[in-house]
Amino acid sequence: VLSAADKTAIKHLTGSLRTNAEAWGAESLARMFATTPSTKTYFSKFTDFSANGKRVKAHGGKVLNAVADATDHLDNVAGHLDPLAVLHGTTLCVDPHNFPLLTQCILVTLAAHLTELKPETHCALDKFLCEVATALGSHYR
């Protein structure tokens, strides 16, 4: 459960997440593809899995914008992300094990770019991204 201090720390990052969604989202996806190549199987139309890949940039932007949107719903992250959880779990059949892999890559990417990231904010982000990963994996059939 996110504390009031966690929520405040996360909300302070929302603007940076939105401003850098495409670049940081693409970098996060590229990190995931590089560290866990099996995740590429869900992206059969992608030919360039680098952070510069056109489709990686587009999807990375969607991912990080969805994460930024979830920061507006910190009291109900799971409820807010439920439509995406249904899509990924029942339509796309994405293995829920992949969501923690991606959120870890997001956390690493943010830590690399946010020089002002204090340990307390890092911890708050980790807790929040764990909630995101759990929510997204909740409808796997």
From Swiss-Prot:
User: Which residues are noted in the entry as heme b-binding?
Assistant: H88
| Limits of the Globin domain | 1-141
**Keywords for this protein:** Heme, Iron, Metal-binding, Oxygen transport, Transport
- Read off the InterPro entries from this record: Globin (IPR000971), Globin-like_sf (IPR009050), Globin/Proto (IPR012292), Hemoglobin_a-typ (IPR002338), Hemoglobin_oxygen_transport (IPR050056)
Signal sequence annotation: none
Which residues are in coiled coils? none
Any single Gene Ontology cellular-component annotation:
hemoglobin complex
On tissue specificity, the annotation reads: Red blood cells.
The keyword Endoplasmic reticulum appears for this protein: no
Residues reported in the UniProt entry to bind O2:
H59
Return one Gene Ontology term, BP aspect. Answer: hydrogen peroxide catabolic process
* Molecular function terms from GO: haptoglobin binding; heme binding; metal ion binding; organic acid binding; oxygen binding; oxygen carrier activity; peroxidase activity
Which PANTHER family does this UniProt record tie to the protein? HEMOGLOBIN FAMILY MEMBER, HEMOGLOBIN SUBUNIT ALPHA
Subunit and partners: Heterotetramer of two alpha chains and two beta chains.
Its job: Involved in oxygen transport from the lung to the various peripheral tissues.
Family that this chain belongs to: Belongs to the globin family.
The protein here is known as: Hemoglobin subunit alpha
Native source organism of the sequence: Squalus acanthias (Spiny dogfish)
Give the source lineage, highest ranks first: Eukaryota, Metazoa, Chordata, Craniata, Vertebrata
